[in-house]
Amino acid sequence: WKNLPGTDGKQHSWDDVSHQDFVVVVFTCNSCPYAIDYEDRIEALSRLAQESDSRFAVVAINSNQIPEDSLQAMQKRSREKQFSFPYLTDATQDVSRAFGAIRTPEFFILDHTRRIRYMGAMDDTAEASHVKEQYLLDALKALKQGRAVTVTETPPIGCMIRKARKKRYRP
C-alpha cells in the first residue's frame, strides 16, 4: 500500500514498516461488533510489537465505505481507545482487494518479502475470556523462531467488509 491516510493525520505506506521482519495487517472497522470485540486484543498485540525484540509491527486498515467508518469517525475511535498502532483508511478499497480480505477483523502476517505467511482469524472466538487457540500469536512465535507455521490459514470471524456499491442499471 501507498499513501493511506491515518488517524494521526499522516500518509502511511508499506515502506514505513518494511524494515520489520514481519508485519501484522488487520482489516478492521468501527462498526462491526466482532471488530469492536477484538480492539483490546489488537491493542495488546501492538504493545507487544513495540517491545525492543519483537521484530514485527501492527497496522490496522479500515476498508468499509459507510459513515460510521469515515476517517473522522476512525480518528474519534482511535482517540477514545488510545490506539498505539497506525489505523488507516482504504477509501479506494484497493488494499483489501489486493489482500483478498473479506471480513472485519481479518488478520494477515507478511514477511519482509511481502509474502503472506498467515491469514484468517486472530484466535478461535470473539469472546476474549473463552480463547483456546491463538492462531496469530502461534504463527508469529513460529516465524520469529525460524520454524514453519503449522496453521497458515483459518476462516476469519466477523462482519463482511462493506464494499462500495456501483450502480449497474442505467435507464
Spans of model-derived segments:
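Loop/turn elements at helix/coil->beta-strand transitions in domains of secreted/extracellular proteins
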Residues: H19-V23, D53-A57, F83-F85, H112
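Structural microenvironment flanking redox-active thiols in thiol-disulfide oxidoreductases
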Residues: I36-K81, A91-A98
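Short, internal strand/loop/helix patches
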Residues: Q75-M119
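Short active-site neighborhood of thiol/selenol oxidoreductases, capturing the structured segment around
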Residues: S13-D37, L140
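Thiol-/selenol-based redox modules, centered on thioredoxin-like
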Residues: I109-P171
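N-terminal "domain-start" segment that seeds a small globular fold
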Residues: W1-D15
